[in-house]
């Protein structure tokens, strides 16, 4: 998986998308009129080796206080249960921040990924068509699982 940050500074089309009025309207309806861009990223997941993103809260990385940020995830390709759509734990944003540990995969620590243990029986998949978006609070527990898809996806 490849993560590219600060896309709005590198690409005019991406910048125009991030500052598109309908997205700003969604953000202001949720957090009020003082909207600021805190962080952006694009995730590129090559087929079959795209990698998983373990359960985490975005604020586990950001550590902002107060934790009053949202993420708007825009699907650049169709994302469903066969190719790494987002999974969330509904209502988890109402809980206190979780302690995150470094993610592990095949007995290796992944220093750039955080992870938290959750009750997966309550998780919900959020499939998105290309061009659609989902919004979640920075304390919402979410993940993307690794799949054996044969198509390269650029979901976020």
Where are these regions (language model features)?
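Acidic, His- and aromatic-enriched active-site or binding-groove loops in soluble protein domains
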Residues: 57-73
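Double-stranded beta-helix
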Residues: 79-143
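Short beta-strand His + acidic residue motifs that chelate non-heme Fe in jelly-roll/DSBH
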Residues: 72, 142-149
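Non-heme Fe(II)-dependent double-stranded beta-helix
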Residues: 1-55, 61-63, 101
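A short hydrophobic beta-strand segment most commonly corresponding to one strand
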Residues: 72-74, 136, 151-156
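Short, structured patches in soluble enzyme cores that scaffold and shape functional sites
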Residues: 41, 57, 74-78, 90
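Extracellular structured ligand-interaction cores
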Residues: 67-71, 83, 123-125, 155
